[in-house]
């Protein structure tokens, strides 16, 4: 099994080109292809998962809605939210889907604890919560034993668009963000801590930064 996990720092990019690129990456990867994690912020967009229902889109307004191929219901992405797309050969890693979700949740819980923010997962509602308010969302797709999509952590963003939807299909679900609990946040530092936690919880020995585009 590879010992180094590669990360691509994409900055801010529109949702659909990144989604299309991760589909291509997953469809074309061979059995020896190294795993990658793509870190990105998106301009405002609602994404509707495969289980999504139209009634959970309350008032999208001027924010585009994209129907996507991950699990779960509707969520919102916007600037100030750290999104990590996990392009992993989970069969090679020996992870089941529930195991991978648990690892992602523990990764986020430990990251938040490093800022002094106690968080927890819920057995019936994937994601990570602080005092009952959701701070991170998870959504995955597994194809040919490989994962894509991933997690979204609210760092320091405008949470108002979440009021235009029932987040993850839950009416009235409160949303929160790291900056509300830990004060001023350096986004790059959150990204660095997330990288370290992913390496740890995905059982890698080290990490590297990958260069080049995703086209």
From Swiss-Prot:
InterPro entries: aa-tRNA-synth_II/BPL/LPL, BPL_LPL_catalytic, Octanoyltransferase, Octanoyltransferase_CS. Belongs to the LipB family. Catalyzes the transfer of endogenously produced octanoic acid from octanoyl-acyl-carrier-protein onto the lipoyl domains of lipoate-dependent enzymes. Lipoyl-ACP can also act as a substrate although octanoyl-ACP is likely to be the physiological substrate. PROSITE patterns: BPL_LPL_CATALYTIC, LIPB. It catalyses: octanoyl-[ACP] + L-lysyl-[protein] = N(6)-octanoyl-L-lysyl-[protein] + holo-[ACP] + H(+). Substrate binds at residues 70-77, 137-139, 150-152. Residues 31-206 form the BPL/LPL catalytic domain. GO terms for molecular function: lipoyl(octanoyl) transferase activity. This is Octanoyltransferase. Pathway: Protein modification; protein lipoylation via endogenous pathway; protein N(6)-(lipoyl)lysine from octanoyl-[acyl-carrier-protein]: step 1/2. Pfam families: LplA-B_cat (PF21948). PANTHER family: LIPOYLTRANSFERASE 2, MITOCHONDRIAL-RELATED, OCTANOYLTRANSFERASE. In the reaction, the free carboxyl group of octanoic acid is attached via an amide linkage to the epsilon-amino group of a specific lysine residue of lipoyl domains of lipoate-dependent enzymes. The record marks 134 as: Lowers pKa of active site Cys. It is found in: Cytoplasm. GO terms for biological process: protein modification process. Its main location: cytoplasm. Keywords: Acyltransferase, Cytoplasm, Transferase. The active site is at 168 (acyl-thioester intermediate).
């Amino acid at each position: 099994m590879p010992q180094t996990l590669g990360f691509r720092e994409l900055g801010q990019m529109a949702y659909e080109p990144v989604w299309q690129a991760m589909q291509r990456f997953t469809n074309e990867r061979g059995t020896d292809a190294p795993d990658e994690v793509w870190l990105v912020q998106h301009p405002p967009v609602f994404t509707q998962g495969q289980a999504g229902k139209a009634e959970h889109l309350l008032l999208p307004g001027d924010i585009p809605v994209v129907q996507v191929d991950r699990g779960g219901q509707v969520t919102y992405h916007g600037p100030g939210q750290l999104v990590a797309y996990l392009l992993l050969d989970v069969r090679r890693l020996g992870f089941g889907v529930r195991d991978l979700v648990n690892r992602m949740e523990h990764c986020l819980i430990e990251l938040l604890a490093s800022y002094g923010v106690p968080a927890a997962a819920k057995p019936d509602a994937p994601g990570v919560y602080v005092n009952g308010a959701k701070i991170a969302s998870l959504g995955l797709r597994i194809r040919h034993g490989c994962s894509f999509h991933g997690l979204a952590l609210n760092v320091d963003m405008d949470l108002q668009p979440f009021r235009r939807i029932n987040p993850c299909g839950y009416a009235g679900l409160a949303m929160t963000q790291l900056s509300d609990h830990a004060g001023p946040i350096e986004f790059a530092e959150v990204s660095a801590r997330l990288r370290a936690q992913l390496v740890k919880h995905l059982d890698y020995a080290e990490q590297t930064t990958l260069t080049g585009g995703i086209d």
